[in-house]
Amino acid sequence: MDEWIRQAVKYANGAIWNNGSWGVRNMRGSETSLSVHATGRAVDLSYRKTEQHPTANRKGAVAFLNIVIANANALGVECVLDYFPQKFGRGYRCDRQAWKSYSKPEIHGAPGGDWHHYEITPAMADSPTLVKQAFQRVFAEIPQ
């Protein structure tokens, strides 16, 4: 996962930063279900502008996110959550290959959250080499 995060931050050109990855904890709002963060396969990438991250911004984060979604299989992406949109955020899942706008509270932090949550496959989480190759293939075709 660490390499996936490094590559994401690199190719997003300063629009995002690591707001949290590995941590053994339950899903927000649940007392019984572990978060995917506890498996080492999830990261929250923030676009919140801070003193340490002066170039972070939603426009760049969404541009990066759109490339990732268009290449989700190649990048090993299983799920992306976008906490910002009204009323209840939205989620992308690999099993439906599409976004779903939530019509009721389903993700803790929506609406208005300033980060995207990414979940990746075990194979990608465990192989820095695969991650580097995938990002290089996907982003080599896109002018920087």
Predicted region positions:
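Glycine-rich loops and low-complexity Gly/Arg-rich segments
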Residues: 105-109, 143-144
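Low-complexity, Gly/Ser/Thr/Pro-rich intrinsically disordered linker/tail segments
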Residues: 121-144
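Secreted/periplasmic proteins that engage bacterial cell-wall peptidoglycan
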Residues: 1-106, 113-121
